[in-house]
Amino acid sequence: MGILDTIRNPQDLSKLTEEQLSQLAAEVRSFLIGNVSQTGGHLGPNLGVVELTMAVHRIFDSPRDSIVFDTGHQSYVHKLLTGRQDFSTLRQEGGMSGYPDRGESEHDIVESSHASSSLSWADGISRARQLTGDGDRYVIAVVGDGALTGGMAWEAINNIAADKRRRVVIVVNDNGRSYAPTVGGFADYLASLRPTIDSFRAAPAYEGTLDWWKRKLQNGGPVGQFTYRSLHAMKKGIKDWWAPQGMFEDLGMKYIGPVDGHNLQAMEHALSTAKNYAGPVIVHAMTEKGHGYAPARAHEADQFHAVGIIDPETGVPTEAGGAQSWTSVFADEIAAIADERKDIVGITGAMLIPVGLHKFAARHPERVFDVGIAEQHALTSAAGMAFGGLHPVVAVYATFLNRAFDQLLMDVALHKAGVTIVLDRAGVTGPDGASHHGMWDMAMVQIVPGLHLAAPRDATRLREELREAVAIEDAPTVVRYSKGNVGAEVEALERLSDGVDVLARRPAGSSENDVLIVSVGAMSELALDVSNRLGAQGISSTVVDPRWLLPVRKSIIALAARHRLVICIEDGVRAGGVGSRIRQEMRAAGVDTALNEVGLPVEFLDHGTRAQVLERVGLTARQITHDVVAQVLGTKVPFARPLPGQEHPTTGSLPKL
């Protein structure tokens, strides 16, 4: 039995010798490599925080002291040390979450996964502790240097630093990267600190001596106070020359570090000093992403930030590769467009490769900007670039657009800025769970005046719609697509005058017009499957892909008027989604055909594969067909009234089975 097998809670760590702790760290790394290689997950970040996490749990008393992990994917070691070792279910349906989860353990405080929020959580928790008489309890926020490029983190620091009584310890996990190398002025500032690992300033004797002289001089009358101010100013100048941590201390935060984040004793010493200070402290820990695993360290792109199923010895993927992904199609096309148009620029929020801007950057490095984890800044900066005659393409994960809604509305749309926003990982994404599903975007952008929204169904349509998007110079455009591989090409029977594609009429040549199926983006294969199943029940259908969901095309409304039922199949929330918008436009045009919004419920959806999540919420061909047949054959659907200028409705009669 290994030492890891004996760990059931953090208190067990206090029983271990220095040698046993070193052995435990090795066992944790071996465990993570062996298990995450079989399930996929965030391997590199967790290999980099083994000793750091052990030190936090040895010095502080979880769950009495609250530990908040920013972004949350660096919490695997925390899970192991709090008694969760069944990693065979990691990120699997019904299994362990890849992020902190309150339902799993009392040691998980925040179900975090969006960056830069941990310090605001720490601020709020510590304020509550003060007001409820628990001010002696600590809040520890573990935050990466990448997350500190987000403005929200600095808003929190501004508030935390204002009250010297609150017991907040901010552990900066500085590995020089978020997904890729951290960029920007703050990254340069941290880089200036890295060579100056300073054990002397973290020594208790140093702090005690300073406190003694401070009290003596400040109580020594005008001369003593003058002497204190003079010595304090001189000390600050020397500190900033020797180890320029002045920015933190100028904000009113005690700074300790940099500390070797892979030296357990050094980390424990720094954290003990921070704990004894009993006020807001920053502990700056330097770590390596993928530490102790050669394949990760050799992987220059992201040091195994997130992996699929790999060979644990070599790090080579074992899953069949080579299929074309949505991201790779975008990457090729935007690079080609950039070759043709010098006004095209790219913007990413610390995810150059994941969102597919790397090929563009390789060809035109001066025209691609990584702004760090700063989606709000990205959108307003893009508006400014558009004002200056450029056409920015902002590529982000769909779930991260949520943070920049105000900038989209007030800075981009209000000013009619020609900005294209490309949303990767739209819809149900799967293993990363509730916070990473890109299911809110279509409902969110419905209320943005003038915005154009496209959802391509296949690779050809992605290339086509991306080019159409960057041709629009007087309004924001959004192009959204799914995670993973692109499906087969879905050719249209015809394209209507306003750009709507008719994908199927079943039965072919039928004069019956029972059901109009509006397929949104990658749901086209599902929509065609539903159409086939309805045909087997004697129910006729027409399947259309609007291509551009906003503004709603007039041909969709005209087709709706000629059918007895409309169903809109989308992989976003039903409330306020595409179907809801089509219904509103139908009513405005005097068309009262019944419409079913077939999409996602307004719920936080747990992790699982995309297929598992869709089945869980009823977005399957079988369930949709069952519901439609019940409506149509149950004669619950009213005939539509004729369009203006027509005497009779043109809907067909009910099939007799």
Curated annotation (Swiss-Prot):
> What segment(s) does the record annotate as region Disordered?
91-110
- What processes does the entry annotate via GO biological process terms? 1-deoxy-D-xylulose 5-phosphate biosynthetic process; isopentenyl diphosphate biosynthetic process, methylerythritol 4-phosphate pathway; terpenoid biosynthetic process; thiamine biosynthetic process
Q: Which GO terms describe its molecular function?
A: 1-deoxy-D-xylulose-5-phosphate synthase activity; magnesium ion binding; thiamine pyrophosphate binding
Q: Where is the composition biased (Basic and acidic residues)?
A: 101-110
A single Gene Ontology CC term: cytosol
Q: Which family does it belong to?
A: Belongs to the transketolase family. DXPS subfamily.
Q: Which HAMAP family match?
A: DXP_synth
- How is this protein named in the record? 1-deoxy-D-xylulose-5-phosphate synthase
State the taxonomy lineage: Bacteria, Bacillati, Actinomycetota, Actinomycetes, Micrococcales
